[in-house]
Amino acid sequence: MASPTSTNPAHDHFETFVQAQLCQDVLSSFQGLCRALGVESGGGLPQYHKIKAQLNYWSAKSLWAKLDKRASQPAYQQGQACTNTKCLVVGAGPCGLRAAVELALLGARVVLVEKRTKFSRHNVLHLWPFTIHDLRALGAKKFYGRFCTGTLDHISIRQLQLLLLKVALLLGVEIHWGFTFTGLQPPPKKGSGWRARIQPSPPAQLASYEFDVLISAGGGKFVPEGFTIREMRGKLAIGITANFVNGRTVEETQVPEISGVARIYNQKFFQSLLKATGIDLENIVYYKDDTHYFVMTAKKQCLLRLGVLRQDLPETDQLLGKANVVPEALQQFARAAADFATQGKLGKLEFAQDARGRPDVAAFDFTSMMRSESSARIQEKHGARLLLGLVGDCLVEPFWPLGTGVARGFLAAFDAAWMVKRWAEGTGPLELLAERESLYQLLSQTSPENMHRNVAQYGLDPATRYPNLNLRAVTPNQVQDLYDIMDKEHARKKSDETDARKTTTGSAGTEELLHWCQEQTAGFPGVSVTDFSSSWADGRALCALVHRLQPGLLEPSELQGMSALEATAWALRVAEYELGIIPVLSAQAVVAGSDPLGLIAYLSHFHSAFKNTPHSSGLVSQPHGTPSAILFLGKLQRSLQRTRTKVEEETPCTEEPPVSEPSVPPALPSEHEEAGAEDVCELCGKRLYILERFCVDGHFFHRGCFCCRTCEATLRPGGYGQYPGDGYFYCLQHLPQEDQKEADNNGSPENQELPTPGDSTTQSGPSSPVPPVTEASPVPSPSQPARRLIRLSSVERLRLSSLNIIPDSGVEPPPKPPRSCLDLAQESLKSSFMGWGVLRAPQVPEAIEKGEEEEEEEEEEEEEEEELPPPLALEVEQSLLTLAKNSGDMTKYPTWRRTLMRRAKEEEMKRFCKAQAIQRRLNEIEAAMRELETEGMKLEVALRKESSSPEKQKKLWLEQLLQLIQKKNSLVTEEAELMITVQELDLEEKQRQLDHEFRGINREETLKTQADRLSEDRVLRKLLDVVNQRDALIQFQEERRLREMPV
């Protein structure tokens, strides 16, 4: 067997090339290798075959085997699929290089231009399972021996670029460094082709290069002309990245990485951080690679308070500009946060140096993310067609905590290469673009959970990666505007079609709503709906609507003797409590007919939720989407407040009692009171427009005003509480607690029981969200007068009447205390090993070659990754992790121990990514709602103004306002669903922490003190409460899933 240090100098060049850790070293060693072998670089696949033929010793052969295995996939057709295709790739980032590799494997000629001359970015990227397998298949372990050797799967951008650069060079990609692509140069005449405009003046070979495919991977700030970019904006979010020198000492290697800590479910960590350092964060991540890499999201007020930002400026670019950021304070901020997160175990933190020799710490803005409206275009001039495709950040900017940049970037690179293959096969332009856009629709929805589980089968063909693939989701007619024949003009036609489509879409909005209301209320005596004002004044139409949608709640016979105001107020309450329809106007306004716009907005909620429900159905219907989720969250919120009030009443107090909240709804206003209470925010006293109205228990606020008293965070259903001592609202993190006794009596938010779905027997009336000014009186009951004496609201009475009284003899006995989770873990572990036979360490020959040993270890890791066992339950997973860390027996099974540790970290990362995605989307929804509110305010002012505007114009404004209301309804739908998931994540984290705490105090009964028993009992009660809450949540989700299944 040949030795790399033998007489063949090419072996030395190859080993230097493989081990090179700087961009310039890679290029120089590869040029030396090509000279030694007499091969011209940049020659495509023929160059690769020449190099492989002359380097046949063991170290090189292991790499060739991997690359050949990839190239043998059917989609590449042995490198003959695109032999006549010429491609230009812009950008040598990870996605650009990955696209270049795929195009080279297809046999295309690939030229890549990059404006930089070296790789210097230390930031660490999280990797999805398929990206790990993909990079291993390209020889990642050969080029970078520490690739994914820790408990977290990640790699620095610089190392990723280096290994992909080496593969691209071996496959014959021609790379030009230090040149910037500035635009396209169309063919001047028939018979010529497309060229690139490049700065500075390129060599003749590059300047004259004509290509028919352009793949742009130039980053988010560069998108070729013709593509439309859409901004996805959220609340202000300031990210901070910091890279510290990794000395690779024993102490540093033992510091655990942090897959992600998010405030959305782990508030104690951030409270401790704030108390110890004064730093207020939303999240923090710590990875170890070439550097110690930290990334975190900081709050603006904290940065201002600690002097990191000099002053508060309205524009984000100015706020985070060099002139407004204090470098020394920023470094101190990042160092303190990193030191606290790692408990000071990294010792003295020294910043790594960036490309300019400065400390590698930066503050950046990810308030908004850019996304291209389309992923590809085709331009044609003088008969020459050019296919343009986007990959990487210029296609979709990633959200850093989720690890989506590399994963979706690689997927986009595969999809773009597949598009080029189809282009080379002669697929028609519109058909090709339709297929590409169908794939693009899937990209933003992809996650490790909804892709094919077997990552070993992933290839260029999209069917190997995406389950339930539909390449005809987008039709050719929908992508005609992406095919640009530059000799013709389509812009005006497209604009006219768009305007006509908008007008047609909105023209039937109010008419459709009115017709639907007429259908739902038809047949009820005394009800005739003809408009959005007087037809609803007596309350009968609204009661009829509620009765039709959910029979049994509002019987028409019960309306006898009720005033219009009482009937309307009753219907509003029942719709809120039983259907989840939040009011946007008061009962007075409905009766007076003074706010038809508000009534339209309110009725549109019914229409959105029940428009697909047959109005002739006699079954009790349940709303889909918003109302079902809001109904559940509303019950949770009332349960939270009711339990706190109960604890306060049971707690003896020697001081002056705080203002108590009534257990019945606020008093109904008299018919003589002035209507329009919903027009003014009860917190700021300013005017409320329809789209701004946020209702809590009959009181109206601006969404921006309804925030935490302490941190000013937006409050959402299920995530806040009202403190009776001052009447203010707080997020659960800052909700004032009474004392430990109250906490033990389940008074804290974490002990609140989630309402059981469909349970209408445990709900009391809501409490007033503001300190009451006058004593509350009960809602008049529509039943017998004697009922009024017990001061029950109508909703409470209805729930009480639906109770099924059964004897207690059939009630199950109290649950037994659970067995130790550690015992369950040990049993699970034993059963996992059953049937394996005797486990022995593999017999390794003493004279094995080092390269063969490394190859065998790498194959073991790949097999372990490809054949993952099915996921375990959360509790068992955590217990197995504890056992893996603490049990001496696990040393006998290092593979299992490594697998358990990795899977536990993966579960942490999944929760973190899910929480961050939710937080990001909630911020985007909030920003979108503010924009809708601004637009709606302008339209509402125009509609309410006494002006001489023609009726046609007013009707158009009304339709536009209804469209905005419907958009807001959709956003509220999504927000409610996300808040359900927030509850799920929070309960999972609480159960994990309580389970860990319970294991820590669980010991032999003879060794327990009285304090131990009390602590164990307290933790056990909390744990059982959380389990019950999770059970209620799962039951709710299952019931909703069954409702949504097609009959």
Curated annotation (Swiss-Prot):
One of its GO terms (biological process) is regulation of regulated secretory pathway. It comes from Rattus norvegicus. Gene3D superfamilies: Calponin-like domain, Cysteine Rich Protein, FAD/NAD(P)-binding domain. Its cofactor is FAD. The C-terminal coiled coil part contains the plexin-interacting region. The bivalent Mical/EHBP Rab binding (bMERB) domain, mediates binding to predominantly Rab8, Rab10, Rab13 and Rab15 (in their GTP-bound forms). Residues 659-668 have a biased composition (Pro residues). Its main location: cytoplasm. It comes from the Eukaryota. Keywords: Actin-binding, Coiled coil, Cytoplasm, Cytoskeleton, Endosome, FAD, Flavoprotein, LIM domain, Membrane, Metal-binding, Monooxygenase, NADP, Oxidoreductase, Phosphoprotein, Zinc. The record marks 816 as: Important for interaction with ARHGAP26 AND ARHGAP10. Residues 745-767 have a biased composition (Polar residues). The modification Phosphoserine is found at residues 616, 777, 781. Residues 1-489 are annotated as: Monooxygenase domain. CDD domains: CH_MICAL1, LIM_Mical_like. This is [F-actin]-monooxygenase MICAL1. Zn(2+) 1 binds at residues 681, 684, 702, 705. It catalyses: L-methionyl-[F-actin] + NADPH + O2 + H(+) = L-methionyl-(R)-S-oxide-[F-actin] + NADP(+) + H2O; NADPH + O2 + H(+) = H2O2 + NADP(+). Belongs to the Mical family. It holds the Pfam family LIM. Residues 679-741 form the LIM zinc-binding domain. Its EC number is 1.14.13.225, 1.6.3.1. The modification Phosphothreonine is found at residue 475. Residues 905-1047 form the bMERB domain. Interacts with STK38 and STK38L. Associates with the SH3 domain of NEDD9. Interacts with VIM and PLXNA3. Interacts with RAB1B, RAB8A, RAB10, RAB13 and RAB15 (in their GTP-bound forms); binding to RAB1B is of low affinity compared to other Rab proteins; at least in case of RAB8A and RAB10 can bind 2 molecules of the Rab proteins simultaneously. Interacts with GRAF1/ARHGAP26, GRAF2/ARHGAP10, RAB8A, RAB8B and RAB10; may bind simultaneously to GRAFs and Rabs and connects GRAFs to Rabs. Does not interact with RAB1 and RAB11A. One of its GO terms (molecular function) is actin binding. Monooxygenase that promotes depolymerization of F-actin by mediating oxidation of specific methionine residues on actin to form methionine-sulfoxide, resulting in actin filament disassembly and preventing repolymerization. In the absence of actin, it also functions as a NADPH oxidase producing H(2)O(2). Acts as a cytoskeletal regulator that connects NEDD9 to intermediate filaments. Also acts as a negative regulator of apoptosis via its interaction with STK38 and STK38L; acts by antagonizing STK38 and STK38L activation by MST1/STK4. Residues 912-996 form a coiled coil.
